[in-house]
A protein has these predicted regions:
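Acidic, low-complexity intrinsically disordered tails
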Residues: 500-526
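Terminal, non-catalytic protein-protein interaction segments that mediate quaternary/complex assembly
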Residues: 240-261, 265-274, 342-371, 380-388, ...
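Conserved DEDDh/DEDDy metal-dependent 3′-5′ exonuclease domain
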Residues: 90-94, 99, 103-107, 119-122, ...
Length: 526
């Protein structure tokens, strides 16, 4: 067992440490004694900025609010106590409380006439989640231990039915909903108090360092210690097992199983995917179910290998857009005719204006010739479908796109293709590399989700030059085109169209949704 010396200066327990304990006791111990600086992804950074924007927006609805100042949490806590005692302030922003080795800060705190307090937590989600309630229960516990009475607890969150009217101004009354969660928080307070005491004790117990990795390492967010912990993992760790539930994972951990090679294929309760996964890693070869080839050949030419690129933002920007509604900004298509000819086409928009009308019109024009769509994930068509209501003038174009039959390649391969290097969650790039040996382009400026988000953010900035925006649009289109090319390569290889592939490769490429197709039922073991 590894040992660690305890921290010389005792840290107070806060929201971050409590969340770490809920995720993994090993993470809790390491975060307490050996915290590491997290590499924030572009998506998390944007979410953080959006959260700050939404917080300021929500605070604007509370009159006579005062920001609690203080360079340290102790100074802020002292200032909070003074303002509450004075009784002249209606709302406090960023109020701080310290008690029993714990510290919390509230988004918005409202003082009632009798001196009791209402807690308001601002969230960017569109519904009240369990972890919101746990966070609020922790706040209520510390506030009451600091000598105050909590009167009510509320969550302010985004109304998913809100339709933006355009521009950058938002009305808190229309965008934000309020939920009274006082009773729900009261019910879980005893359990949260017990967890808090247990977590505080756990920081003094280094036995947590022997805990194995698991699905909790990446849920709800990736653990900052995962890169180091994964060095001790076997080649096929248990957390990469498909269809793995927390209950089954806990059961296997109790049996001392952390390596898929330890699992028996005949073990009861294993799903079809799990059995096939064990077979492919033990046989060290790809297993392809017969229906995969059949499905890939049961197509309608021309085939449009289509990549639809979208981004999702909490706060809508364009007319009729709703919170968290996906926004399409690019598409790329490799169209294959029955004779083997391939044409390339695409569209990308990089500016502050609404990309949706031109996106819909350009893609509809490309698909007007008929044929079938081959997509990595058909959920992208739901993004197109969501345009019907806000883009009344473009409904005909949108219906042209949705009228095309389609095949969801990810769903097909997850149910019928098993490869030793494709465990757990599969992406298009990882699948193309494992099956076709294709590496995703990394030499260009836009090559993954984070770089896409950075590019879109930069393009929407007013000060960005026109020439820079043109380059960003070209990079976004190139990124989408690489995704479409991977789809075509996968189809050719898995449908055994080698001759067609060779013929198409010899010819230079020319530059230039519909009812969901049902897959065959998952095979059942004899």
């Amino acid at each position: 067992m590894k040992t660690r010396s305890t921290t010389k200066v005792q840290r107070r327990f806060d929201k971050r440490l409590f969340e770490a304990g809920q995720q993994c006791l090993k993470r809790l111990y390491l975060d307490y004694h050996e915290p590491v600086e997290e590499q924030e992804s572009e998506g998390r950074r944007i979410m953080s900025e959006t959260g700050k924007q939404l917080l300021q927006l929500a605070r604007g609805a509370f009159a006579r609010g005062v920001e609690v100042e203080g360079k340290t949490i102790d100074q802020a806590a002292d200032k909070t106590q003074q303002l509450i005692a004075a009784g002249s302030v209606f709302a406090l922003f960023g109020a701080a409380f310290v008690a029993d080795g714990c510290e919390v800060r509230t988004d918005i705190l409202v003082r009632q006439k009798d001196g009791s307090l209402d807690i308001f937590e601002v969230k960017s989600g569109t519904k009240v989640k369990g972890r919101y309630l746990t966070d609020l229960a922790l706040q209520a516990i510390v506030i009451e231990r600091a000598g105050h009475k909590v009167h009510g607890v509320y969550v302010l969150y985004l109304d998913k039915t809100y339709k933006h009217t355009g521009g950058t101004d938002y009305s808190p009354k229309g965008l934000v909903k309020s939920a009274d969660v006082t009773e729900r928080v009261r019910r879980i307070q005893p359990r949260v108090a017990e967890q808090l005491a247990a977590f505080q004790r756990q920081t003094k117990d280094d036995s947590a360092l022997d805990l194995p990795t698991g699905t909790f390492c990446t849920a709800p967010f990736p653990c900052p210690h995962l890169a180091n912990c994964s060095k001790q993992e076997p080649e096929f760790p248990l957390r990469s097992f498909p269809d793995l539930t927390r209950e089954i994972e806990r059961e296997l951990h109790e049996e001392g199983i952390a390596d898929l090679m330890q699992l028996d294929e005949a073990r009861p309760s294993l799903t079809f995917r799990q059995r096939r996964t064990l077979q492919c890693i033990k046989q060290k070869e790809t297993i392809r179910e017969p229906f995969v080839k059949e499905e890939l050949l049961h197509v309608e030419f021309p085939l449009h290998f289509l990549s639809i690129a979208t981004t999702t933002e909490a706060l809508p920007r364009f007319v009729g857009q709703k919170p968290w509604q996906a926004l399409p900004y690019a598409w790329a298509c490799e169209t294959l005719t029955a004779g083997g000819a391939v044409t390339q086409s695409g569209f990308a928009y990089a500016d502050k204006d609404d990309p949706r009308p031109e996106f819909a019109q350009s893609l509809a024009k490309q698909l007007a010739s008929g044929g079938m769509l081959i997509l990595w994930n058909a959920d992208s068509l739901e993004c197109v479908r969501s345009l019907l209501e806000p883009l009344a003038a473009d409904k005909q174009a949108i219906r042209v796109i949705l009228a095309r039959p389609h095949l969801d390649l990810q769903r097909l391969l997850e149910s019928g293709l098993f490869h030793p290097n494709l465990l757990g969650e599969r992406g298009l790039a990882a699948t193309a590399k494992a099956i076709c040996g294709i590496d995703a382009p990394t030499e260009q400026d836009v090559f993954d989700e984070d770089s896409v988000l950075r590019a879109i953010q930069k393009a929407s900035t007013p000060r960005t030059r026109a020439a820079t925006k043109e380059k960003i649009a070209a990079d976004l289109r190139s990124y989408a085109q690489s995704q479409a090319a991977m789809l075509l390569a996968l189809w050719r290889l898995l449908s055994d169209k080698q001759e067609a592939a060779a013929e198409a490769a010899a010819k230079p490429a020319k530059k230039t949704a519909g009812p969901r197709k049902q897959l065959p039922p998952t095979p059942v073991e004899d």
